[in-house]
């Protein structure tokens, strides 16, 4: 992890003025995280904020900037899941992959710019350990009309 004046991911989040959200129970018959060896697979997290789901359609009422912010909100949820699962974000050795889905109008081709919100935040929090492979696709609908959904896989340090 890149060394800065902020020695932990939690300190970096605080310095950015970001707070991990409260986690509701999964919305179906699944778990939010599944650990296999040193890997943690995270279920998709839709964009939510203090007022609930961040809904919308990119290219039809929602802008790239709206989507970028929604993708960041998804990552905050995923970090909250990881903290609950691992006890501390210090246990994250590296982010391996991010799959980003954007609720997009037909012809909207800027899904990568939207998902940059997720990628940028992960690198801000974890430094080079946050750099990952990625998929960014536009889809015709997401659960609860969410603007963005993010699924991630991370590698963890053994305790």
Language-model-detected regions and their locations in the chain:
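Short, polar/acidic, helix-capping and beta-turn segments at strand->helix junctions
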Residues: 2-159
């Amino acid at each position: 992890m890149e060394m800065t004046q902020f020695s932990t991911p939690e300190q970096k989040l605080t310095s950015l003025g970001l707070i991990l959200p409260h986690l509701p129970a999964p919305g179906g018959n699944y778990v939010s995280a599944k650990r296999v060896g040193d890997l943690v697979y995270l279920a998709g997290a839709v964009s939510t904020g203090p007022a609930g789901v961040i809904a919308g359609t990119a290219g039809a009422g929602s802008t790239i900037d709206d989507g970028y912010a929604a993708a960041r909100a998804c990552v905050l949820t995923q970090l909250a899941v990881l903290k609950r699962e691992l006890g501390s974000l210090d246990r994250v050795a590296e982010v391996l992959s991010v799959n980003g889905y954007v609720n997009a109008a037909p012809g909207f081709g800027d899904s990568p710019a939207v998902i940059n919100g997720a990628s940028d935040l992960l690198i801000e929090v974890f430094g080079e350990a946050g750099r990952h492979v990625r998929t960014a696709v536009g889809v015709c609908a997401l659960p609860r009309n969410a603007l963005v959904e993010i699924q991630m896989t991370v590698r963890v340090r053994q305790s």
